[in-house]
Amino acid sequence: MTRYRRVVVKLSGRAIAGSAEFGFDSNALEHLAREIIAVRQSGVEVAIVVGGGNLFRGNQSDRWGIDRVEADNIGMLSTVINSLLLRGKLTALGEDNLRVMTAVPVPAVAEPYIRLRAVHLLEKGATVILACGNGQPFLTTDYPAVQRALELNADAVLAAKDGVDGVYDSDPKINPGARLFSHLSYDEVISRGLRVMDQSAFILARDFGMPLHIFDIEQRGAMTAICRGEHRGTVISSSPEKSEEFGNEVLASPAESTA
């Protein structure tokens, strides 16, 4: 028995880059694909919103001396490349019911995102990979991940982070004493200025009550465990009372957990 029937997985470009940090890492790609397959085999319907930061980021426009909208267009096309690569790896591992849908038309390699068709594909057991965010500039793929989850009637967003196992009260890479939150409300995340995702994504999730799970994609089986109802990382929802199984306690810091 699973807790969730349908989820949207937010997959960053950095997760695809793995140890390479830029471009692609074959081991990271295979790990991601196998984790997705495991969730599908548990009976959960899966849509994936793919980022493109391993190839290009729209906020690099000043560095390249180009217009921000043009830079965001390049970033959106980067998500198409990552989506095709992920589809290719899933296919190589035996998955055959896959679709790549794009918010910006790229008809030679993918089909356009049409909400009702995406819902139909999910109901028929397809894994739907969503590229180009929502087709608009000045956004990362965080906001579109929540938007697509709402449009597709998903039960939750699973935000896969590379090497970060949840939301901390400060940057654990800088502060060894940073403490991991088990649960936070949307308003707590916004008021504390916690930047694990864009605030616009938190606001949209709050306004429509979409649960968010922030977890480390490097932890094998974490996505499947979350869908089964087990706790991994940090859950962000309306209030602690609505997620009593998690509470809003602060867990041990990385230094304490390894002591």
Swiss-Prot record:
* Keywords associated with the record: ATP-binding, Cytoplasm, Kinase, Nucleotide-binding, Pyrimidine biosynthesis, Transferase
Substrates-to-products reaction catalysed: UMP + ATP = UDP + ADP
Keyword match 4Fe-4S: no
Task: Please tell me whether the keyword Kinase is annotated for this protein.
Answer: yes
GO CC terms in record? cytoplasm
* UniProt GO BP: 'de novo' CTP biosynthetic process; UDP biosynthetic process
Supply the EC number(s). 2.7.4.22
- Activity regulation, per record: Inhibited by UTP.
Q: Where in the cell is it found?
A: Cytoplasm
Which positions are annotated as binding ATP?
K10, L11, S12, G13, G53, R57, Y168, D171
Q: In which pathway does it act?
A: Pyrimidine metabolism; CTP biosynthesis via de novo pathway; UDP from UMP (UMPK route): step 1/1
Ranges for region Disordered = 236-259
The record's top EC class is transferase
Q: Name one GO molecular function term.
A: ATP binding
Q: Where does UMP bind?
A: G52, D72, N134, G135, Q136, P137, F138, L139, T140, T141
| Self-association and partners | Homohexamer.
Main function = Catalyzes the reversible phosphorylation of UMP to UDP.
| Family, per entry | Belongs to the UMP kinase family.
- Protein name per UniProt: Uridylate kinase
Q: Which gene encodes it?
A: pyrH
